[in-house]
């Protein structure tokens, strides 16, 4: 069968299901694909297919994630669902599946549970910008007051972690009913349709990566006689044009330069765009002024920092991580984009040590500055071996 052409006419949005184990995340994921296939003509995916999610690797960490897609009238959605709680933690911290918005699934019969809270906290830490709530299993709750109570609890919990709890859309329904094609009291297919319409209206269209300010991590530096210095790398975001002023940020003092040429596959171009591997020719920059690990950016868009708070996941022994816990003052290397920088960790109050397999908030101080922003992902390494992953939650200095 020939591969279908990817439809670029609809804007593309990344979402995912989060919430406590057995509250119905995977059932809702399957129901979304079913309802959208009937209403908007995308393909349905069976529950079992999603539940036996394949393994994938992100930053040296194995994660089980199921990716499905569905369409609404106005958008194409890529949706990620994880089978286990540990997979969620790893997924969100490594950014393996970046989400423009999350669907928090909470059982109306049980109300918020420990992982409900933890997933909301993680969403805040890793910068998931929007959450929509689906109160699931509402067909099992006869008491309208109980539904109201659970709704209030969920709103309070969202507000606790700085999400707009009072204004968050909450859809009440039954994913199982929708998956079976039923719709008693509009709790099945109607509720799931309403959820899709809510995703359309509540989660804004993400800024396209080419519209963001230019940033390219420097992987290599060459000097070409008679032409000057060329830095190569994969453009992370934005566009660079010939004659653009640029800054080189990180590891040393920030320097200013100008792009005098863009090269890809030995051809000269007028511009380089996000996602492309290219060489950027720099005017007035010496070969020794630049090194791998710095970034080339639009002036003023990114600053170098050495101190930050991060949410980290520490690999378990089985995943090839450490065999022993670490304590405050732990000094591994932090691998940002293209280079390692040594840093020391302070643990939160009341936390004596961090065990392999844990996730925890730490404060990090690096020995050299790195170009960083909230949401930047990194790996934690010891002598080149990955022992953890993290995300910058808040810059301190």
Curated annotation (Swiss-Prot):
Subcellular location: Cytoplasm
Region (G4): 136-139
Region named G2: 60-64
Region (G5): 174-176
Keyword Electron transport (UniProt): no
UniProt region (G1), positions on chain: 19-26
Keywords from the UniProt entry: Cytoplasm, Elongation factor, GTP-binding, Hydrolase, Magnesium, Metal-binding, Nucleotide-binding, Protein biosynthesis
Function as written in the Swiss-Prot or TrEMBL entry: GTP hydrolase that promotes the GTP-dependent binding of aminoacyl-tRNA to the A-site of ribosomes during protein biosynthesis.
Protein name: Elongation factor Tu
The species this protein was found in: Pseudomonas syringae pv. syringae (strain B728a)
Native organism taxonomy: Bacteria, Pseudomonadati, Pseudomonadota, Gammaproteobacteria, Pseudomonadales
Gene: tuf
């Amino acid at each position: 069968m020939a591969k279908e052409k990817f439809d670029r006419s609809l804007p593309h949005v990344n979402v995912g299901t989060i919430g406590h184990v057995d509250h119905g995340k995977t059932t809702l994921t399957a129901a979304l694909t079913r309802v959208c296939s009937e209403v908007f003509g995308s393909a349905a995916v069976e529950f079992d297919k999603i539940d036996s999610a394949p393994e994938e690797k992100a930053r040296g960490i194995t994660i089980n994630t199921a990716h499905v897609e569905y369409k609404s009238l106005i958008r194409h959605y890529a949706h990620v669902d994880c089978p286990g709680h540990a997979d969620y933690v790893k997924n969100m911290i490594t950014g393996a599946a970046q989400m423009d918005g999350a669907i928090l699934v909470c059982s109306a019969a049980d109300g918020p549970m420990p992982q409900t809270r933890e997933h909301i906290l993680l969403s805040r830490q890793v910068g998931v910008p929007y959450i929509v709530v689906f109160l699931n299993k509402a067909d099992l709750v006869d008491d309208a007051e109980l539904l109201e109570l659970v709704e209030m609890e969920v709103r309070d919990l969202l507000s606790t972690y700085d999400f707009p709890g009072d204004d968050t859309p909450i859809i009440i329904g039954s994913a199982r009913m929708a998956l079976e094609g039923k719709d008693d009291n509009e709790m099945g297919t109607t509720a799931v349709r309403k959820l899709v319409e809510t995703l359309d209206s509540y989660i804004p269209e993400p800024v396209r990566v080419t519209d963001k300010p230019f940033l390219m991590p420097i992987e290599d530096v060459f000097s070409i006689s008679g032409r000057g210095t060329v830095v190569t790398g994969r453009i992370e975001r934005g566009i660079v044009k010939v004659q653009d002023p640029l800054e080189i940020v990180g590891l040393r003092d920030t320097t200013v330069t100008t792009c005098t040429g863009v090269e890809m596959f030995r051809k000269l171009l007028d511009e380089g765009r996000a996602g492309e591997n290219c060489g950027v020719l720099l005017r007035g920059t010496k070969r020794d002024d630049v090194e791998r690990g710095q970034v080339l950016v639009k002036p003023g868009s990114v600053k170098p920092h050495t101190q930050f708070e991060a949410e980290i996941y520490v690999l378990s022994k089985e995943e090839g991580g450490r065999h022993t816990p670490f304590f405050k003052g732990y000094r591994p290397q932090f691998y940002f984009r293209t280079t390692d920088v040594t840093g020391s960790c302070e643990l939160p109050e009341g936390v004596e040590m961090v065990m392999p397999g844990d996730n925890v908030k730490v404060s990090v101080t690096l020995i050299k500055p790195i170009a960083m922003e909230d949401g930047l992902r990194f790996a934690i390494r010891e002598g080149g071996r990955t022992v953890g992953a993290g995300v910058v939650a808040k810059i301190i200095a």
